[in-house]
Every structure is written in structure tokens, then in C-alpha cells.
């Protein structure tokens, strides 16, 4: 068995690392510490004992839910900030809940918190909290949300994603080390830039001196100049055959290096165009560094590494 404290610590640190790019490490770390607090309950420990053939007749093993305890602690101790954590903790196995409403009477978070409020009185939970809560502190949110609906919602979803991914990966590392090792490590985007531009420059030199190729070179140069600007929304309008894929990728590499971005993500409206784009990028970056992920992907092209990468988009492109 993996000790609860070890799992919580591992998930906390991994989630914090995932949240570092959007300055939310402390929030994600506390999510990791709280997410399985309910597993300290006597009833959950009885459930584990029964499931492993160990006698434990003193407690009811039928109730083995565990996500409510951390959510209850967060809302009780941290107020409005705690509700943000509560959404993520309560939903880390089943999806983010609504505050009110929901498909079932107790599916909404408000109802769940009211129903499970007594979980914090469990002696085991009390002991666990007493041993750890001195370190459970939060800074102010890293953003000022002018649009509290959309901005706050997206931030909660990002925190939730950090928690879910960290929880899954730490459990996988403990339960299935071979699968975890199969995830491999990908090169940083910066490491792919040099071979990409070397091949792109060579392709441009080999191209015959035609008017079309002159315009393609101008488009690429314009894209690379635009990459020096501050992050935001950019528009590229080029006729068919104008070299959009490679010019846009050149922009993406330059912009990522300039502003410390870690991924290039293509979101394209037709699977046929996704396939063409992915094939082009593989020629420049190699098969292993480009993840093609859409509903029409041919399973025969999949490898174990690509299936694992599709779970959390770890590939650089």
C-alpha cells in the first residue's frame, strides 16, 4: 500500500509544478494535500481492510467516499477561497460539480458539503488535520479577475487539471511502474527549434527562384517579425499554397522562445487538415515529438507512447 501522507505529498509537489507556469503553485499544492483527506476516515480504512481480506468489523465499510473531507475543510477554514479548492477536491474523480442544481439530489457541491460536514469530526481525520494543517495556507489569487465568470472559471479548471493529472500520475507510478516509465521524456521546445529552422532554411534555399517562393519567404519573414511582439491574438491570412503551416510554426517557435512558452498546439477545424499538418510537422520534428489527437486518428498509427501522451498532451507539439 502507498501511505496516504506519501501520496498526498507527491501529488502536492507534482500539482504545484504543473501550476507554476500560471503562478498558482501554492493553490495547486494545497489541492494535492487535501484531495484524499477523506481516506483517513475510519470507514475508508475499514473498506481497505475488507477489500484486502483483513478483518475490521468495528466500522462500516460500505461508505468509502473520500473526496468530501478535503472540500469540507477548505470551505470551513478558508471561506470563499476554500470554495475554489472545494470544487476541485470534490470533483477530482467525477468532474467539477455545480454549486447548486446537478443531475442528482446530492450531486451539487452545496448539498454534498452540507451532507458530509460531520466527516471532519472523524477521529482519524482530526488527527491527520492536526498534524498537517499548520502548513495549509494560501496566498491571494495570482490574478485579478475583471470578468469573474469566465476568468475565474478557467482558472479553477486549470487548477483542477493540475490536481487530476498529478493524482493519476502518482497513482500510476506506484501501481504500474512499467507503464509510468513508458511515458518517456520529451525534448524541450527550444531543443526542437534549431533542427526545425535548419531544415526550413535548407528547404527555402533549395526552392527555385519563382514569384510564389519569393512571396512565401516574405510571409515567413513577416511571421517571424510578429513573433517578437507581446503575447496575444494574431491573425494570418494567406492564400492556399502560401506556406501557412511552416510560416505559422516558425512564428510559434520564435514566440515560444521569446516568452517562455512550452507547447505548440494546433487546433484546426477539419480532421483532414489536421492530418496534413501533422504529417508536415513530423517531417521536420520527427514522429515522436508530434502528437496527433483527434476523433479520426488511425489506431494502427498509435504506439504506447503516443497513447500515453494523448492522456495529458505531454508532447511538445
Role assignments for model-derived ranges:
Residues 261-284:
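Conserved Walker A/P-loop ATP-binding site and its immediately adjacent core
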Residues 229-236, 261-263, 315-317:
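Pre-Walker A (Motif I) flank of P-loop NTPase domains
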Residues 230-253:
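Walker A/P-loop
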Residues 7, 200-237:
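Conserved pre-motif I regulatory segment
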